[in-house]
Swiss-Prot record:
It comes from Methanosarcina acetivorans (strain ATCC 35395 / DSM 2834 / JCM 12185 / C2A). One of its GO terms (molecular function) is tetrahydromethanopterin S-methyltransferase activity. This is Tetrahydromethanopterin S-methyltransferase subunit H. InterPro entries: Dihydropteroate_synth-like_sf, MeTrfase_MtrH/MtxH, MtrH. It holds the Pfam family MtrH. It catalyses: 5-methyl-5,6,7,8-tetrahydromethanopterin + coenzyme M + 2 Na(+)(in) = 5,6,7,8-tetrahydromethanopterin + methyl-coenzyme M + 2 Na(+)(out). Part of a complex that catalyzes the formation of methyl-coenzyme M and tetrahydromethanopterin from coenzyme M and methyl-tetrahydromethanopterin. This is an energy-conserving, sodium-ion translocating step. MtrH catalyzes the transfer of the methyl group from methyl-tetrahydromethanopterin to the corrinoid prosthetic group of MtrA. Pathway: One-carbon metabolism; methanogenesis from CO(2); methyl-coenzyme M from 5,10-methylene-5,6,7,8-tetrahydromethanopterin: step 2/2. Signal peptide: none annotated. The complex is composed of 8 subunits; MtrA, MtrB, MtrC, MtrD, MtrE, MtrF, MtrG and MtrH.
Length: 316
């Protein structure tokens, strides 16, 4: 496909490497657990869930990674400080190395999670999700005081969804912020910024989302990713059309997985692929594209890192 002239940063969190030239490293896959209305959760406020079912889901992802060579990260979503602490406790009990995103719709919950990870000594595996234009000072203060050094930096510009708008929000500010998000991240003590290009709906900036991947990597040299599956879930036509079909999921899933593959070809280093239940569908598809990217990288003179475990070697 292509090779960037600019040096591409490679960051490591919990043994997982993010960044580099397209095809140099296997694409990182980020699952989501304990999301809103996740069927394994019985009480979202107290963090009560089916531990056996959760572990089965997690072990499936581990097995798929072993088969393909694609590394993985877990996105832990909590709606209260109590629930997210319980989810983190469960995760670090069953897995002692894998990095995880701490995520919530509430800033005070994200802040509490960053503080908790510091207290229990796992901040080196935690990735704050996210530093964005709506972040409040209270969250900034706690994140700064924490030991968390990795964060998703969101390139969401509410007033300008273009590629320029995404770069502006990262570098100079906008949407009510007088500082760029990268500066805010640096002031919070973030040493590992992972750019989320903020996937926009089809017809409302989806093209700019994909184009921003190589643009941001080319200009800033930072690892780039996103929750591209949101393009499919926000597609009004598809939502309506699938309901008219005998097997709505069969209609929906190719589009869901496909959004990730398009972004991957454009240079995305990591994919927040959504519910962990989709793990068996996404891993083989992403590994397939990684083989193509790996072959191209070799032709362009890029040395494949850990070639033995890369899909281009392992699966061919």
């Amino acid at each position: 496909m292509f090779k960037f002239d600019r040096k591409q940063e490679v960051y490591e969190v919990g043994g997982v490497k993010f960044g580099g030239q397209p095809g140099e490293y296997p694409t990182v896959l980020v699952s989501t657990m304990f999301y809103a209305r996740h069927k394994i959760v019985t009480d979202e406020d107290k963090g009560i869930f089916d531990r056996a079912a959760a572990e089965t889901l997690w072990n499936t992802q581990v097995s798929l990674s072993d088969a393909t060579g694609n590394p993985y990260v877990n996105q832990i979503v909590g709606e209260t400080p109590e629930s997210i602490r319980k989810y983190i406790d469960w995760f670090i009990e069953i897995d002692d190395k894998t990095p995880f995103l701490i995520d919530s719709s509430a800033g005070e919950v994200r802040a509490a999670a960053a503080q908790y990870c510091t207290e229990i000594g796992v901040a080196n595996r935690a990735i704050h999700n996210s530093i964005n234009a709506s972040i409040e000072q209270s969250e900034i203060d706690i994140l700064t005081e924490s030991d968390v050094e990795a964060a998703i930096v969101l390139a969401f510009n509410a007033t300008d969804p273009t590629v320029k708008g995404k770069l502006d929000i990262l570098e100079v500010g906008g949407s009510g912020q007088t500082k760029g998000m990268l500066q805010v991240a640096e002031e919070c003590g973030i040493k590992i910024p992972l750019i989320d290009v903020a996937a926009m709906p089809l017809g409302a900036g989806s093209g700019a989302t994909i184009r921003s991947i190589p643009t941001i990597k080319g200009k800033l040299g930072l690892p780039v990713g996103g929750g591209y599956h949101n393009m499919a879930s926000a597609w009004d036509w598809l939502r309506k059309f699938k309901k008219t079909q005998p097997d709505p999921k069969a209609i929906y899933m190719p589009a869901d997985i496909g959004t990730n593959l398009v972004a991957q070809i454009a240079g995305s280093d990591f994919l927040l692929y959504g519910p962990i239940e989709n793990v068996e569908k996404v891993f083989p598809a992403v590994a397939m594209v990684d083989i193509m990217l790996g072959e191209t990288a070799k032709e362009l003179g890029v040395e494949i890192a850990d070639s033995e475990n890369h899909p281009v070697t392992r699966l061919t």
